[in-house]
Amino acid sequence: MNAGMKNGINLLMILVLFISCVQEKEDDNVLSRVEACMELFPDSALSLLSQIDCPECLRGQQRADYALLLTQALDKNYLDSLQSDSLIMIAVEYYKQEGDKLKAGKAYFYYGKVMLLKERFSDAMQAYLEASSLLEETRDYKVQGMVWEYIGYLNSVQGLYENSIDNFKHSIRYYELASDRRRILYGYRNMARGYFSVHHNDSAGWYAEKGLVLSDTVSGMKASFLHLLGLIANNEKRYPQAIEYFSNAMEVCDNLNDKYRYSLSLGRVYSEVGQKKKAEDCFVSCINATNIFVSSGAYYYLADMHKKDGNYLKAFLYKEKSDSLLEVTRNAELQKQLLDLQNKYENDKLILENKQIRLENEKQTYFCLLYTSPSPR
């Protein structure tokens, strides 16, 4: 090889190294900008992440940071269907190996959320507990509060309400340390719901009232606390107060789906006190709700009203509509169960095939060794 060719190769290698360093620096800048805008502008964070030309080319910390930030951005933009446990595991494994407790704790938290989406509840709980253990020695109180909040949700889903109440208390303590007003309100609402679930109406009302006082400064929360207070009043047969709470909740609510839920609750109280026309108006207004359970509930209560009035034909028709909506939900759940079974079958089949291939390879290797080995002297 002549000197000119050697110089050309060296120059090319230097150029490639330079371009690589420049690209690495650009990716670092993008990841830093993503981290800075994640909380307030998650849509911008997701858009910035798309500027990284070759995510699969990232290595080490850049790769882990990208995996964590993309999982966060998808979560905050409600793109649950795009979440991947293999993606967030890149971050989990890297940060844990490097001893970065803060980022490892965050990664475990988001891994838990992905497991929750997949309804793998025990895996989610294990991830949250691991996150809590790692974050204990950090000062990221907000994420610690979120971890305990989700542990509370998991316990609540399983009917362990007393445990969930204790978890939610932990979350409030951390949110107070983080001075996060919005999440403190979430904590109060969780506590109120938890106590309401175990029929401790006094405690439920105390937290709901406490949240209501603070809720004016946080959009969307006031209606939620008013609805909770309405449920408590209705449970205690304080119907005039329940009607007032539900009506006020609907008045201040700016979310259409929530407004339908509040209208359904209001209709039930009107039905209890014999104001049938008002009850019917509330139920009819909920028929077009996008939430199948709300619209099905509206048809169910209309059927019940007409049955009590002796109008059995109308009652039957409304009951049919209620049942058909629930059947759609059941079919969707059944399809999911069948798909899960099919995926499990395919995975088991693949594992079996791999085992067979491995055994066949081992047999071939054995026979090769048998026929090529020298005979004993």
Predicted regions and their residues:
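Hydrophobic positions within repeat-based interaction scaffolds
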Residues: 28-32, 36, 43, 85, ...
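TPR-repeat structural position
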Residues: 42, 80-81, 101, 121, ...
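Structural motif corresponding to the intra-repeat A-B loop/turn of tetratricopeptide repeats
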Residues: 77-78, 118, 158, 178, ...
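N-terminal leader/linker segments that initiate helical-solenoid repeat arrays
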Residues: 21-69, 78-82
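Residue signature of alpha-solenoid helical repeat architecture, marking inter-repeat boundaries
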Residues: 24, 61-63, 102, 142, ...
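Conserved alpha-helical positions within TPR/SEL1-like repeat arrays
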Residues: 68, 75, 106-117, 142-157, ...
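Amphipathic alpha-helical segments of tetratricopeptide repeats
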Residues: 50-54, 89-94, 130-136, 170-174, ...
